[in-house]
A protein has these predicted regions:
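Mixed-charge (Asp/Glu-Lys/Arg
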Residues: 1-12, 17-143
Length: 143
């Protein structure tokens, strides 16, 4: 089996540490009841400004694309939660695609607040990773 321990407090990028077979695996957990998962585009992308115009120079190389994310869609009733398990690289690719598309649509200038880098992704964007527990098991040498 897997032993998992949550972290209380502010540990960057790690909410749970899983351990099995002499291997440990940091896991980032995001939970939501409805809506979207908000984040900051600057975390995932290299964004610079030319006045109010945002220019994406590419994906940030500071990101650990292999960090495991578990997105929990909390159900209405006990036992109805959905789990989506994927690498942080999936999030970075989604943010890159959608953020670029949005900036292209608005000629590089965010309509409400040109300086914001707020962005989000949705459960529908990661539905293919539902119950993808094998990602964790493989990383812990349990395959």
């Amino acid at each position: 089996g897997v032993v998992a321990t949550p972290f209380a407090g502010n540990v960057p990028d790690i909410d749970v540490l899983a351990y099995a077979n002499g291997k440990s695996l940091p896991i980032q957990v995001k939970a939501l009841r409805k809506g979207e998962i908000s984040t900051n585009g600057n975390i995932y992308l290299d964004i610079r400004f030319d006045g109010d115009t945002q220019i994406i120079d590419g994906k940030s190389e500071e990101i650990d694309r292999e960090l495991v994310f578990v997105l929990v869609k909390i159900g209405k009733h006990y036992g109805e939660d959905d789990f989506f398990i994927f690498n942080q690289g999936v999030v970075q690719d989604l943010i890159f695609r959608e953020y670029s598309k949005f900036l292209d649509k608005h000629n590089g200038i965010r309509p409400r607040n040109p300086r914001t880098t707020h962005c989000a992704y949705h459960v529908k964007d990661v539905v293919e990773y539902r119950d993808n527990w094998d990602l964790i098991f493989e990383r812990l040498g349990m395959d």
